[in-house]
Amino acid sequence: VDGNRGFTTKDAVRLSNECQHIPFVFEQPCNSLEEIASIHQRLHHPIYIDENGIDIATVIRSISLGIADGFGMKVTRIGGLHQMSLFSGICEARSLPHTCDDAWGGDIINAACTHMGATINSKLFEGTWLAQSYIEGHYDSKNGIKIENGHIKVPKGKGLGIVPDEGVFRNEVAIY
């Protein structure tokens, strides 16, 4: 159940109490880590931190507060592939499950998430979410990332395994 920071603490506790026999993960129910910390012990469901996971320091803080039972993490939110790799290592050291998600990009971020997801300990890996099925076309028409029967093949080849058609990037905002 993804609260997207929209629940008050009162409503988050109420939902968890009224649905205590229904198994689910409560993803980012409240707006702040402080709000989540104030109710965490009164909930019947594990909490995944999502929108508040903006950097490694915040991830470590949420783990230290004991309020992160797992994470829904986007590569772009945490700061790119290097930070995502560091984040994943922290989660592995603490046995915390997590995702490796796309933040509504195209083939480039899809390939990055797919490659990164393939490196996560399978016991802790909650999956990779890609926006691919909501986006028309591909930057790389030959090797573009595709979700088939719920699975994603890790791209082969150099780098991320895709070769974007440079023609799709025609209208430069700036050239340096």
Which residues fall in each region the model found?
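Shared catalytic-loop signature of beta/alpha-barrel
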Residues: 23, 31-48, 54-151, 155
